[in-house]
Amino acid sequence: MSRLATKNILITGGNSGIGPAPAQEFDREGARVAVKLDHVTRTYRRDEFEVRALDDISLTIPTQGFVAIMGPSGSGKTTLLNLVAGIDHATSGSVMVGEEEITTMNERELAAWRARHIGLVFQFYNLLPVLTAFENVELPLLLTHLSKAERKTHVESALQAVGLADRMDHYPRQLSGGQEQRVAIARAIVTDPTILVADEPTGDLDAKSAEDILLLLTQLNRQFHKTIVMVTHDPRSERFVDTVYRLDKGVFIGSEKGGMSDHTTGLVAPAE
């Protein structure tokens, strides 16, 4: 796998230093598939009642795509995202990432897989206040076999990629909300994950900072070829993604092309 030509950037869009990326299949349009959900249902028990958070979901997400999962509160967006990230388990059906069936993995296997392939970004940044931006971004690498010098190179590359090369020694209290989210994104990409999973990444930001973060995610997708799956309520997000997936009451109701797509926008019914 070739590295990007950008100076000092080691992020490749494919899991360069943590383990081999999985082989991938192709969808009906010839695009490589990053994620495939096949008749996935997720139910929970609440007292004597069964709650169906996701109901027979089938969809694919293309490799190097930037997709938004949207719908009203309680529609199952975060549940779907948690299944893709290997944080939760499907009650039935199959979740494939590349050619790896993650629904059959035990907790130990799933944790190891998640560390290799998934970068997580949340609405709240979850930065440790006693650590600098550099030290916060370095945290995931402390669990790897990289040397201190190698970790330094990866951290500097990640912070440069999010536009914070000059803020490495700053503590969270010295950063704006948008800058804190950039640190959180750098922490998510520092291991060069296969997929970046973002849950309401602009939900705690003002309008300008939110748009800056969406532009950054677009850059990571376009320049560094990251597959990005984002849950959001923010209608502005539709301008920045390739495809919007719509959920309602746990049901996948269709998809439409986003503003970054080269195709005409229009509702597309889910595949049978």
Language-model features and meaning:
Residues 1-8:
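Flexible N-terminal pre-Rossmann segment of NAD(P)-dependent oxidoreductases
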Residues 15:
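Conserved glycine-rich cofactor-binding loop
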Residues 19-20:
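N-terminal Rossmann-fold NAD(P) dinucleotide-binding loop
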